[in-house]
Structure formats: C-alpha cells, structure tokens
Amino acid sequence: MISTCITVAGSDCSGGAGVQADLKVFTAHSVYGMSAVTAITSQNTIGVNGVHLIPASYVEQQISACLLDVHCEVMKTGMLFNQQILKVIVESIDRFKIKKVVVDPLIATRKGALLVMPDYLELFVKELIPRAEVLIPNIAEALIILKHMTNEFVEIHHLEDVKAVGKKLIKAGCKNVVIRCDDIPFASDFFCSRETNMPPTWYLYVLCTSEGEVLLPQKWLASKTARGTSCALSSAVASNLAIGLDLVTATQNAVSYTQRALEMSFHLGRGANSLDYASALTRLPYEKGEFINFVRYHPSITPKWLSIVNHPFVEQLKAGTLSRLPFQKYLVLKYHMLINNAQAAGMMAFSSSSISAIEHSAKIIQAIKEENVTHLRICEQYGLSASQITKSKPEIVKSHSLFIHDTAQQDGLRGIQIAMLPFVFMIQEVVSQISASDGYPYVAWVEHCKDKSATSHIETLLESLETNSQIISLSKVQHLLGILEKSLDFERLVLDTSSSNESSVF
C-alpha cells in the first residue's frame, strides 16, 4: 500500500514554498500527498505581496475531507497563522490519531523577527509541541521557543552551543528537535566563521533526541540561496517517516535530499533561486523491504549469478570434491578483496563531510578486520602461511582495487555495500546449503561462514541497504545494478582464476 502524508500550510502561488513545495517533496519520495491550505498568498521569487487567510472552519473541513477518506498517520505543519487555525490542527491530530507530526514552526525569520502574535506562541508551545514527533526550527526559532519555555537564552558561537539549545529543548518537553542553522556559516573547527574570520565550511543541521545529538554537517554553499529549504527539509522528514524509516535515518536522508535540491537549484525568476524538488523523483520498482530481492532476481543479474552457482568450482565445493589448490587460491583472492573493501571504506570516510557516513564506514572496516583475523586463521588450517597470502597482489586484485575505489568515490557507502553482495549471496545460497559432515574437506571455512558473527555482519549490511533503498532515484537504482553486475563479473573471475592451472596467486 502506498504511503500517505498530509501537509497543513499556506499556499505559494509561485510554487517555491508552502503546500506546493510540500507536495513536490512528497511526490519525489513516492509518498501520496494531501493538503489543507491555511492561507492563499500572492508571492514570487522576490517576495510576498499579499496574504488571504482561510477561515479555521474551512481548514478543518479540508483536513476532514482528506482523513475521513484516506488513511494517514503522518502530518506536516507549516505556516498556521493564528490561534484559531492552530486549535483546529491540534483537535485534528487527536481526532484522527495522527501518529507522527512534523512541525516546521514558521514563527520567526532567520534574523529572529517574530511572525506570530504572543498568544499564538503560547498555544503553540502548550498544545502543538507536545504532539510533535519532531520540531524543525531554524536557530532563531529554536532560541525563541527556548526562551518561552524556560526563560533561558544561549548565545551561538560554536557547534556545542547549538547542541546545548537542543538539549534544553528536549529537557523542556520537546520529543525530538532538528535545528537548522540558517544564516550562520560555521568554519572547519565548528566555530561561527563570522566571529573567527575563517572561511565558511559547514551548514549545520543538528538532530537532538533524548538519547543524544546527531550532527549532520553539509557543505556551505555561499552562492546558493533559495526559497523553500525549510519546507523541503520538513516535508522530506515527514515523507521518510511515512514510508517507515526511523527518525535518525529519516532526518539523514532528508538533509541529503535538501542539500541536493539546493545544489541543483536554478535561477528561474528575478529573485532567489528555485529548489530542484524533483532531484530525487522516482517511482521505485520495488516495495519497502524488497530491494535485495529486486536486485538479486533482476533480469540483468540472474544470468550472471547462475554462471557463478553453476561454475565447476562451486559444484565441486558443494560436493566436497574440490581439490586443495583451487580452494587455497580462492582464500587468498578473497583476503585481498576484503582488504580492498576496507581501504575503499577508509578512503570514503576520509573524504566525507558526513559524520554518520564516517561512522558507517568505520563499522565496515571493523567488520572486515574481524573477518580477516578469522580468515587468516582458516588459511593457516589449509596450509597457507601469512607470507604466501600477503606477499603479492595478482592482477585480478589490482583490477578489483580500482573498481572498488572508483565505486567508493562515486557512490559512497551504498556502492561499497552493493559490491559486497555477491559474496553475501554465495553464503546465503551456496554455503548455507553445504552439510559440513565428517569427511567434508573444508568444514572450518563452512562453519565460519555460518557462524553468528558472519551472519550478523551480513544482516547489518542487508538492513542498511534496505533502509536506504527508499530514497534513491530510479537512475540510481539502475546505476547500482551496474555496480552489482561488475562485482559479479569479479566473483566469476575469482572462480576462473582459482580453478585455472595456469594462474599464479601465491
């Protein structure tokens, strides 16, 4: 069933913000979007020159028309304008049992000028914030809300000050907060660049939860100013929650989407740039949780995979008739390819500006390190010394190194994980079927491939790919299939090289 989301916000006739922007974002994430308009505005890329409020009763009528007909568990709110409309929203959340509410406050400009009346702010804090799954204010709004809730004020000089604001908001009653540091560029040391005279490096997003803070720095784009970035971010978070992602992943993906939309923004009118909301436009050819099955059984993949499972090496491995030398060659080649994967993950971490991507790269490296320790021990059991394994790199290993490094540079963590799938398939569909009974020559290797440590690493890799497979373009899916095809070619080449009497591996 298709995921749904409703936005309650103002209308922007020029399409750059408001419900028009929200609906574009929903569509780009393959989420069916509905809307309730709170005001009709006359605006363009230069500015707003007219606002016509919709009566609160008619806002309620719009919401009811949608939600009495279509099941929806996620709501995104934008500009609500007055107390009457705000009360309608609160009542609708309760009436329709909306599970997750994403709130873009829109109570102040980036400079901190208040856009709403004090009585609105009072009701906003008292009634809407407690119902919000996540609040997504700019830093000025976060400070205003904090002042209202706790009478505290924090001066922003460094990243740690932003985190402090988030912690205080959580302590004051906000469930989760994503702070957008609009108009404040940060230097490479995470101090405000305007105070240190250092060149701007980072645009900061900070996700704050009861469990801690997640820093999501993005490259500062000095030449890119565009309308609708808050709409894009909050609607992307709502979309990701609607398709079932957890909040951290939903926010990470939303930040990446917003950054990409900003990077690809274009000059359409005479004022600010227009975001490329369609930068992730896709109708994915698989359902949630079916990405791995989709790529495994894709028509371009199946013939290559069959050429592997029907390879004489694999047939003999399953039967227990594979001689020692081909198996030794296979172990050596697999060792080098694991090292290549670890090096590519390390290179990706070194060049990444995303803390979460660095963390995931580190996990891959740690998993490969643990695997290699066991792998070397197994190699020794089958008559291979450490010097035999490491002293030289066959040509296939050098070619694989170029491939996996290029993949890491172009496609990051997801590309590396896709390139690791052939061996995952080998374990799942070949090794798991081998009965390593008495007399089977490679019991230690089979048992290792089946043990809890190995299967746990595989499960983590597959879960990561599934989680991140909902927010990619169709062209990216095709590109990833291309990576998998090349990786399967290398897997086949490993089998050919291991089986060949003419090839030298050690």
Curated annotation (Swiss-Prot):
Catalysed reactions listed for this entry: 4-amino-5-hydroxymethyl-2-methylpyrimidine + ATP = 4-amino-2-methyl-5-(phosphooxymethyl)pyrimidine + ADP + H(+); 4-amino-2-methyl-5-(phosphooxymethyl)pyrimidine + ATP = 4-amino-2-methyl-5-(diphosphooxymethyl)pyrimidine + ADP
Function: Catalyzes the phosphorylation of hydroxymethylpyrimidine phosphate (HMP-P) to HMP-PP, and of HMP to HMP-P.
GO MF entry, a single one: phosphomethylpyrimidine kinase activity
Highest taxon listed in the record's lineage: Eukaryota
Listed pathway(s): Cofactor biosynthesis; thiamine diphosphate biosynthesis; 4-amino-2-methyl-5-diphosphomethylpyrimidine from 5-amino-1-(5-phospho-D-ribosyl)imidazole: step 2/3; Cofactor biosynthesis; thiamine diphosphate biosynthesis; 4-amino-2-methyl-5-diphosphomethylpyrimidine from 5-amino-1-(5-phospho-D-ribosyl)imidazole: step 3/3
Keyword presence, Cytoplasm: yes
Alphabetical list of PANTHER family matching this protein: HYDROXYMETHYLPYRIMIDINE_PHOSPHOMETHYLPYRIMIDINE KINASE 1-RELATED, PHOSPHOMETHYLPYRIMIDINE KINASE
Protein name as catalogued: Putative hydroxymethylpyrimidine/phosphomethylpyrimidine kinase 1
InterPro entries xrefs: Haem_Oase-like_multi-hlx, HMP/HMP-P_kinase_dom, PM/HMP-P_kinase-1, Ribokinase-like, Thiaminase-2/PQQC
Keyword annotations: ATP-binding, Cytoplasm, Kinase, Nucleotide-binding, Nucleus, Thiamine biosynthesis, Transferase
Recorded GO CC terms: cytoplasm; cytosol; nucleus
Family note: In the N-terminal section; belongs to the ThiD family. In the C-terminal section; belongs to the thiaminase-2 family.
GO aspect biological process, one term: thiamine diphosphate biosynthetic process
SUPFAM superfamilies assigned to the protein according to its UniProt record, in alphabetical order: Heme oxygenase-like, Ribokinase-like
Source species of the chain: Schizosaccharomyces pombe (strain 972 / ATCC 24843)
Main location: cytoplasm
Enzyme Commission identifier(s): 2.7.1.49, 2.7.4.7
UniProt keyword Zinc, yes or no: no
Residues annotated to bind 4-amino-5-hydroxymethyl-2-methylpyrimidine: Q43
Compartments, record wording: Cytoplasm; Nucleus
